[in-house]
Amino acid sequence: MSQKPVLVILGPTASGKTELAFRIARKTGGEIISADSRQIYRSMDIGTAKPPKWMLNEVKHHFIDEKEIGEPFSAGDFAEQAAERIRELRQRGITPIVAGGSTLYLEGLLKGFAELPQSNPEIRARLKHELELHGAEALYRRLEAFDPEQAKTLDPTKTQRLIRSLEIIEISGTTVTALQRKTSGPPPGIEFTVIALDLPREVLYERINRRTSEMMHAGLEAETRHLFDKFRDEWRSKKLNALATVGYRELFEHFEGLYNLETAEALIAQHTRNYAKRQLTFFRNRLDVEWVKGPLDEAGIEALVESLCEKIA
């Protein structure tokens, strides 16, 4: 008998993925494969909206608290290891449920990777020099002109992927978007059912605003202060990409004296809304998903849990 497909629950930040995946896993006796590139790091708890301890104790979550900040872990590492764990769980008769919103993690697992050209040190050095001279906005506008679809998925302030995208265009003569259409495919022997939670924009933004306030009340400032005291040199030299995460970046800048705490909180909410918009653009343009209405109340959650359990159990 052929195995049922693996359920993948994706959606923008604050859309309810964590709660939905937990309930399905609890009902089916399953385990959760977390596709979140920041929750994998220890000491980044409040700002990454990790599931609470009682959830982690009740249902096994993979790829949460498995790495120290600074340990390398790429989208390729995730795709390979997630496929291995899915196979292991199935061999033990356990239902795996993938849930998360990290775009490159999800794309790597579901579609595989495109063959991208190797980095060219001369081109990369020149682009970095142009970044220093003209700033990230100028390079972002250039990418918008050449590859608007890729630009929509990027945070203009995170320059590593911006430079890499422009480098690929110069080396290959084509865009990242065009190259990504030719991927290596999903892992052998695993089929996926991919659903994405769709919420009215005003509801999603209100959830983001409320969650930002809740994070601050839960101690995000103190959590970030601990990280700032430990990693301020790495932050200033931009050596740790994890520290550029929304929620931490703004508070690091507050500790550096760039603005007051109230402004930092407002920026966290604003930047999180921007991130959610980029996630939605990515899911719609780059992944093959079934959009479902995100539940707005308890009855809606229970109905969706029942419906999705039928697909996989």
UniProtKB/Swiss-Prot annotation:
- Which family, according to the similarity comment? Belongs to the IPP transferase family.
UniProt cross-references to InterPro entries, sorted A to Z: Dimethylallyltransferase, IPT, P-loop_NTPase
Q: Which Gene3D superfamilies match?
A: 1.10.20.140, P-loop containing nucleotide triphosphate hydrolases
- Where do the annotations place substrate binding? T13, A14, S15, G16, K17, T18
What gene is this protein translated from?
miaA
Q: What is this protein called?
A: tRNA dimethylallyltransferase
Sequence intervals crossing the membrane: none
Keyword Nucleotidyltransferase listed? The answer is no
EC numbers for this chain: 2.5.1.75
- Determine the domain of life of the protein's source: Bacteria
Name the chemical reaction catalysed here: adenosine(37) in tRNA + dimethylallyl diphosphate = N(6)-dimethylallyladenosine(37) in tRNA + diphosphate
Query: What's its top-level EC category?
Result: transferase
